[in-house]
Curated annotation (Swiss-Prot):
Subunit structure: NDH is composed of at least 16 different subunits, 5 of which are encoded in the nucleus.
Family: Belongs to the complex I subunit 3 family.
Transmembrane parts of this sequence: 9-29, 64-84, 88-108
Location (main, coarse): plastid
Annotated Pfam families: Oxidored_q4 (PF00507)
Membrane topology, as annotated: Multi-pass membrane protein
Compartments it resides in: Plastid, Chloroplast thylakoid membrane
InterPro entries listed in its UniProt record: NAD(P)H_OxRDtase_bac/plastid, NADH_UbQ/plastoQ_OxRdtase_su3, NDAH_ubi_oxred_su3_sf
GO-annotated cellular components: chloroplast thylakoid membrane; NADH dehydrogenase complex
The name this protein goes by in its record: NAD(P)H-quinone oxidoreductase subunit 3, chloroplastic
Function: NDH shuttles electrons from NAD(P)H:plastoquinone, via FMN and iron-sulfur (Fe-S) centers, to quinones in the photosynthetic chain and possibly in a chloroplast respiratory chain. The immediate electron acceptor for the enzyme in this species is believed to be plastoquinone. Couples the redox reaction to proton translocation, and thus conserves the redox energy in a proton gradient.
GO biological process: one example: photosynthesis, light reaction
Amino acid sequence: MFLLHEYDIFWTFLIIASLIPILVFWISGLLAPVSEGPEKLSSYESGIEPMGGAWLQFRIRYYMFALVFVVFDVETVFLYPWAMSFDVLGVSVFIEAFIFVLILVVGLVYAWRKGALEWS
């Protein structure tokens, strides 16, 4: 039988952790001065007015490089718990992790051959 009262501490923590940011934003909205005018709507960068246009178009190579970085960053997140419990999990999990890394290496070789890792 599922007893809900076993999770009272969890639900209390969840409610308090949700209410604190809501209350902080609500109180700051009540106490903050309201200023309207052209200065409120002006754009600035690091405290000064921007020079030239604010919109820049990035080359697609930056996006590809960032995408490859995110893929291998997520790989690290998945492999870290596996490495910490390597001695407990056994051979089958080692084979699964090896297949996972192999798939990512194939993706890395593909990205390398397509030129996604080159800056020129």
